[in-house]
DNA sequence: GCGACAG
DNA sequence: ATCTTGTCGC
């Protein structure tokens, strides 16, 4: 029964930006809060930097009072404005907050933390635990068709690509759509999975830029996608995080979850494959020490982001050249 | 003070 | 990821 509840809430359309700006509006005039307190109200203190980022791209500073968000040590912090933090100080003083030398006097007295929130990131963590339970390490081991995915970004727009190899045939697809979730460490799947789902065509293996079970809750983007699309999947990341390494094997809480197959290339199983199988599979499909479908997907999405998505036909021919 | 924080 | 308003632990 709990499983069926989880199935009905994949969070793909959840707009964290709107939810977040709603929280910022709760800060009363004459009070301040911190980036960390807002992150806690979202459900996880690790989101503090994402809070700063979302404030920085706020398009409506007249109704969303960014300037009431300050650093944990009582200094006012940054502000995107021609006048910079000076303008932040001016607005705080206009609210009656005493600021001396960029520091709020009697900080505790003015601090607001009583947000009305249901901490959405907590429910998302629970959903990740459900995804992790669905991971299976056994599968076919041989894959005829491979689909590789990557996503590039502007502030509120994403350009996502998929490159499919079926024997000697290569097809490439690009889509563009708005973004409803910022990058938050540990929550990448809630930002990127919906683009992968939209692009997805039947393939035996999904190759994904990010981690699989190499994740604090064993449910990185590649596992999230593999489980929800019921496909074999592998995560390929450039940076190692939140784990320990002995030789080239990566561990999380003493469980092997990935392999460093070279500097700046970490492979972890997403679904229907194990740690060694995922590393062997990626090693078989690289060209110049990089799995070529992923490289192509990366180039496709970045190129489309740079040109604003205008028809810059980066075509099948160049795909063949790279292969 | 410096590094960690998947993209 | 892009070029950017954090926080915590060592
Ligand atoms: Mg990427």
Swiss-Prot record:
GO terms for molecular function: deoxyribonuclease V activity; metal ion binding; methyltransferase activity; RNA endonuclease activity, producing 5'-phosphomonoesters; single-stranded RNA binding. The keyword Cell membrane does not apply. Pfam families: DNA_binding_1 (PF01035), Endonuclease_5 (PF04493). Its cofactor is Mg(2+). The active site is at 66. Its main location: cytoplasm. Mg(2+) binds at residues 150, 209. It is found in: Cytoplasm. Residues 1-91 are annotated as: Probable methylated-DNA--protein-cysteine methyltransferase. Its EC number is 2.1.1.-, 3.1.21.7. The keyword Nuclease applies. Residues 92-323 are annotated as: Endonuclease V. SUPFAM superfamilies: Methylated DNA-protein cysteine methyltransferase, C-terminal domain. GO terms for biological process: DNA repair; methylation. Keywords: Cytoplasm, DNA damage, DNA repair, Endonuclease, Hydrolase, Magnesium, Metal-binding, Methyltransferase, Multifunctional enzyme, Nuclease, Transferase. One of its GO terms (cellular component) is cytoplasm. It catalyses: Endonucleolytic cleavage at apurinic or apyrimidinic sites to products with a 5'-phosphate. The record marks 183 as: Interaction with target DNA. Gene3D superfamilies: archaeoglobus fulgidus dsm 4304 superfamily, Winged helix-like DNA-binding domain superfamily/Winged helix DNA-binding domain. DNA repair enzyme involved in the repair of deaminated bases. Selectively cleaves double-stranded DNA at the second phosphodiester bond 3' to a deoxyinosine leaving behind the intact lesion on the nicked DNA. In the N-terminal section; belongs to the MGMT family. In the C-terminal section; belongs to the endonuclease V family. This is Bifunctional methyltransferase/endonuclease. It comes from Thermoplasma acidophilum (strain ATCC 25905 / DSM 1728 / JCM 9062 / NBRC 15155 / AMRC-C165).
